[in-house]
Every structure is written in C-alpha cells, then in structure tokens.
Regions:
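Hydrophobic anchor residue at the start of the ABC signature
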Residues: 10, 77
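Conserved signature/switch motifs of ABC ATPase nucleotide-binding domains
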Residues: 62-65, 83
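Catalytic Walker B motif of ABC-type/P-loop ATPase nucleotide-binding domains
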Residues: 88-91
C-alpha cells in the first residue's frame, strides 16, 4: 500500500521534495489529510508543531539541499507523524540521527502510539530499538530470498521507558 491519509511512511532516505521548504514538505501532507476539516491557520499550526517535535523549527524555510542528512530525515519523520496515520510504516527511520535526537524521537514515537492508537511497522537494525519500541519482533533470514526466521513477542510491560527498560531484570542486553 502506498502512503495515504491512513498510512504514513518514513523512508530510510528522507524522500523530500527538493523544491519545497521543510515547512512546505510537511504542510503538503498535513493539507492532504486535514485540509477538508481544518482552517488554514490550524493546518499551519499542525505543521509547525510537527517540525518542532523533531527539533526543526529553526529550519522552516530552508530547502532540503540547505540542511544535513539527519535534518532531512527529521523532516521526513515530522511529515509522517503530522498525518496521525492509523498505520505508520518506518524503514530504519532513526538510523541517520545522532544519539540524542534518536532517543528523543523514539520516546516521542512511543507517546504518539499511545495517544493515537497507531500501528507501527518498522524495520530497525538496532536490537535495543526493536525491543524498546515493539510488542512483536519478526526476524528475517539473510539473503536476497529472505524469509521469516522467528517471531518473538516482547514480554515487557507498557508504557515502556528507556531507563526502566535497562533496569528490568527480564530485559537481557
């Protein structure tokens, strides 16, 4: 399924439109989803809030070529989260981010899922990230003909917090 009002996608590569500003890249998605039910001012507020959430409010008017790769990824994440989709598909969304931003956005994602009831399907390569964010982990075999290797249920209580997870005796590093 392609991106749409009920499906947000965060690609491994940011996939921003190069001729639009950071604000306009996010606003395009917000307008598509909420344009029929919200005023222009509400749409702008929602867009600005999404960019603020990912720490990009300082770059609203910059175009993708004017910001770093990690910043581009944050704008892509803001675009998907601003849509409040029922299903959020994420392909290594935090891989290009610095550790502090990654941790903050992981925590924000946990909160957004609780608030919106969204389902997240994510492809991470970081085991700790998978355990923190997931209820079930589907492990794949290696190679071009990859298949499902094992499905693991994460037995840790929700809500999950990073610090509490590290101290939980059932969590083995």
């Amino acid at each position: 399924a392609a991106p749409g009002p009920e499906r947000g996608v965060v690609f491994q590569n940011h996939s921003l439109l190069p001729w639009l500003s950071c604000f306009d890249n996010v606003h395009l998605a917000v307008e598509r989803v909420f344009g029929a039910t919200e005023t222009g001012a509400q749409l702008k507020t929602r867009t600005a809030a999404a960019l603020d959430l990912v720490g990009m409010s300082h770059a609203l008017h910059k175009r993708p070529h004017e910001i770093s790769g990690g910043m581009k990824q944050r704008v892509g994440i803001a675009r998907a989260l601003a849509m409040e989709p029922k299903v959020l598909l994420m392909d290594e969304p935090f891989g290009a981010l610095d550790a502090l931003t990654r941790a903050r956005l992981q925590d924000e994602l946990l909160g957004i899922v609780v608030r919106t009831g969204s389902t997240v399907v994510m492809v991470p390569h970081d085991v700790d990230e998978a355990v923190l964010l997931s209820d079930r982990i589907v492990m794949m075999t290696n190679g071009p003909a990859a298949t499902i290797g094992e499905i693991v249920t994460v037995p840790l209580q929700r809500p999950r917090e990073r610090v509490a997870l590290a101290e939980d005796p059932t969590y083995v590093h």
